[in-house]
Protein backbone atom coordinates (compact mmCIF):
# COMPACT_ATOMS: atom_id res chain seq x y z
CA UNK A 1 0.00 0.00 0.00
CA UNK A 2 1.50 3.37 -1.00
CA UNK A 3 1.33 6.64 0.91
CA UNK A 4 -1.25 7.87 -1.58
CA UNK A 5 -3.59 5.02 -0.59
CA UNK A 6 -3.30 5.57 3.15
CA UNK A 7 -5.62 7.57 5.32
CA UNK A 8 -3.74 10.78 6.25
CA UNK A 9 -4.45 10.08 9.93
CA UNK A 10 -2.34 6.90 9.62
CA UNK A 11 0.77 8.82 8.52
CA UNK A 12 3.29 10.17 10.99
CA UNK A 13 4.05 13.88 10.74
CA UNK A 14 7.20 13.43 8.63
CA UNK A 15 5.36 11.15 6.18
CA UNK A 16 2.44 13.55 6.02
CA UNK A 17 4.69 16.50 5.21
CA UNK A 18 6.73 14.49 2.69
CA UNK A 19 3.63 13.24 0.87
CA UNK A 20 2.17 16.74 0.78
CA UNK A 21 5.42 18.13 -0.66
CA UNK A 22 5.53 15.33 -3.26
CA UNK A 23 1.96 16.06 -4.32
CA UNK A 24 2.62 19.80 -4.51
CA UNK A 25 5.45 19.10 -6.95
CA UNK A 26 3.21 16.72 -8.90
CA UNK A 27 0.49 19.38 -8.99
CA UNK A 28 2.99 21.91 -10.34
CA UNK A 29 4.01 19.49 -13.10
CA UNK A 30 0.45 18.52 -14.01
CA UNK A 31 -0.65 22.18 -14.00
CA UNK A 32 2.28 23.11 -16.24
CA UNK A 33 1.41 20.40 -18.77
CA UNK A 34 -2.28 21.32 -18.63
CA UNK A 35 -1.45 24.96 -19.44
CA UNK A 36 0.75 23.81 -22.33
CA UNK A 37 -2.09 21.69 -23.71
CA UNK A 38 -4.51 24.61 -23.37
CA UNK A 39 -2.08 26.92 -25.14
CA UNK A 40 -1.62 24.49 -28.02
CA UNK A 41 -5.38 24.10 -28.26
CA UNK A 42 -5.75 27.90 -28.34
CA UNK A 43 -3.29 28.06 -31.23
CA UNK A 44 -5.17 25.34 -33.11
CA UNK A 45 -8.48 27.12 -32.49
CA UNK A 46 -6.98 30.35 -33.79
CA UNK A 47 -5.92 28.53 -36.96
CA UNK A 48 -9.41 27.07 -37.35
CA UNK A 49 -10.95 30.53 -36.91
CA UNK A 50 -8.56 31.95 -39.47
CA UNK A 51 -9.70 29.36 -41.98
CA UNK A 52 -13.36 30.24 -41.42
CA UNK A 53 -12.84 34.01 -41.57
CA UNK A 54 -10.21 33.92 -44.29
CA UNK A 55 -7.88 36.10 -42.23
CA UNK A 56 -4.44 34.70 -41.48
CA UNK A 57 -4.00 34.60 -37.72
CA UNK A 58 -0.74 32.69 -37.71
CA UNK A 59 1.79 33.24 -40.42
CA UNK A 60 3.27 29.95 -41.59
CA UNK A 61 6.21 28.99 -39.44
CA UNK A 62 6.10 32.05 -37.12
CA UNK A 63 3.67 31.87 -34.25
CA UNK A 64 5.79 33.72 -31.71
CA UNK A 65 4.63 37.21 -32.61
CA UNK A 66 1.01 36.25 -32.06
CA UNK A 67 1.43 34.37 -28.79
CA UNK A 68 0.55 37.20 -26.38
CA UNK A 69 -2.72 37.90 -28.17
CA UNK A 70 -3.66 34.28 -28.83
CA UNK A 71 -2.86 33.05 -25.35
CA UNK A 72 -3.98 36.12 -23.43
CA UNK A 73 -7.29 34.55 -22.48
CA UNK A 74 -5.54 32.23 -20.01
CA UNK A 75 -3.84 35.04 -18.10
CA UNK A 76 -5.38 35.71 -14.69
CA UNK A 77 -5.02 38.31 -12.00
CA UNK A 78 -2.71 36.18 -9.91
CA UNK A 79 -1.96 32.82 -8.48
CA UNK A 80 -4.49 31.04 -6.30
CA UNK A 81 -1.69 30.02 -3.95
CA UNK A 82 1.69 31.42 -2.98
CA UNK A 83 4.25 30.71 -5.70
CA UNK A 84 6.86 28.03 -5.21
CA UNK A 85 10.23 27.96 -6.93
CA UNK A 86 9.74 26.97 -10.56
CA UNK A 87 11.12 23.68 -11.75
CA UNK A 88 11.70 22.47 -15.28
CA UNK A 89 8.90 20.00 -15.98
CA UNK A 90 9.72 19.53 -19.67
CA UNK A 91 10.93 15.99 -18.97
CA UNK A 92 7.82 15.00 -17.00
CA UNK A 93 6.08 11.98 -18.61
CA UNK A 94 2.94 14.03 -19.33
CA UNK A 95 4.99 16.77 -21.02
CA UNK A 96 6.74 14.15 -23.14
CA UNK A 97 3.38 12.59 -24.02
CA UNK A 98 2.02 16.00 -25.06
CA UNK A 99 5.11 16.69 -27.18
CA UNK A 100 4.70 13.33 -28.91
CA UNK A 101 0.99 13.96 -29.50
CA UNK A 102 1.78 17.32 -31.09
CA UNK A 103 4.71 15.99 -33.10
CA UNK A 104 2.67 13.06 -34.42
CA UNK A 105 -0.06 15.48 -35.51
CA UNK A 106 2.39 17.73 -37.35
CA UNK A 107 1.49 20.73 -35.22
CA UNK A 108 4.77 22.53 -35.88
CA UNK A 109 3.16 24.23 -38.87
CA UNK A 110 -0.61 24.40 -38.28
CA UNK A 111 -1.43 26.18 -41.56
CA UNK A 112 -0.18 23.18 -43.54
CA UNK A 113 -2.58 20.73 -41.84
CA UNK A 114 -5.75 19.77 -43.69
CA UNK A 115 -9.06 20.61 -42.03
CA UNK A 116 -9.46 16.96 -41.05
CA UNK A 117 -5.95 16.79 -39.60
CA UNK A 118 -6.54 20.01 -37.66
CA UNK A 119 -9.82 18.64 -36.31
CA UNK A 120 -8.19 15.36 -35.25
CA UNK A 121 -5.38 17.30 -33.59
CA UNK A 122 -7.86 19.47 -31.69
CA UNK A 123 -9.81 16.39 -30.58
CA UNK A 124 -6.64 14.69 -29.35
CA UNK A 125 -5.58 17.83 -27.47
CA UNK A 126 -9.01 18.21 -25.89
CA UNK A 127 -9.04 14.58 -24.73
CA UNK A 128 -5.51 14.94 -23.37
CA UNK A 129 -6.39 18.16 -21.53
CA UNK A 130 -9.50 16.56 -19.99
CA UNK A 131 -7.47 13.57 -18.79
CA UNK A 132 -4.80 15.83 -17.28
CA UNK A 133 -7.48 17.99 -15.66
CA UNK A 134 -8.99 14.91 -14.03
CA UNK A 135 -5.57 13.89 -12.72
CA UNK A 136 -5.07 17.41 -11.38
CA UNK A 137 -8.43 17.27 -9.60
CA UNK A 138 -7.44 13.98 -7.96
CA UNK A 139 -4.13 15.48 -6.82
CA UNK A 140 -6.00 18.49 -5.37
CA UNK A 141 -8.38 16.21 -3.47
CA UNK A 142 -5.46 14.31 -1.95
CA UNK A 143 -3.62 17.56 -1.13
CA UNK A 144 -6.74 18.92 0.56
CA UNK A 145 -7.02 15.79 2.72
CA UNK A 146 -3.35 15.98 3.72
CA UNK A 147 -3.57 19.72 4.44
CA UNK A 148 -6.71 19.25 6.53
CA UNK A 149 -4.94 16.60 8.60
CA UNK A 150 -1.92 18.88 9.10
CA UNK A 151 -4.19 21.73 10.22
CA UNK A 152 -6.02 19.40 12.59
CA UNK A 153 -2.75 18.27 14.15
CA UNK A 154 -1.56 21.84 14.70
CA UNK A 155 -4.95 22.92 16.04
CA UNK A 156 -5.21 19.94 18.41
CA UNK A 157 -1.62 20.29 19.63
CA UNK A 158 -0.36 17.04 18.09
CA UNK A 159 2.20 19.04 16.11
CA UNK A 160 3.80 22.36 16.95
CA UNK A 161 4.86 25.25 14.80
CA UNK A 162 8.14 25.25 16.72
CA UNK A 163 8.76 21.80 15.24
CA UNK A 164 8.85 23.37 11.79
CA UNK A 165 11.82 25.50 12.83
CA UNK A 166 13.74 22.39 13.90
CA UNK A 167 13.25 20.69 10.51
PLM regions and their residue ranges:
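Charge-rich amphipathic alpha-helical interaction elements
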Residues: 1-167
Amino acid sequence: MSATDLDPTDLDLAELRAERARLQTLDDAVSYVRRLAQARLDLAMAEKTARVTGEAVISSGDVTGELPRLLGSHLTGGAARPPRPAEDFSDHPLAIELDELCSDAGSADLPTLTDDQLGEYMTALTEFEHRVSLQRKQVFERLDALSAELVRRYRDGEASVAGLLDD
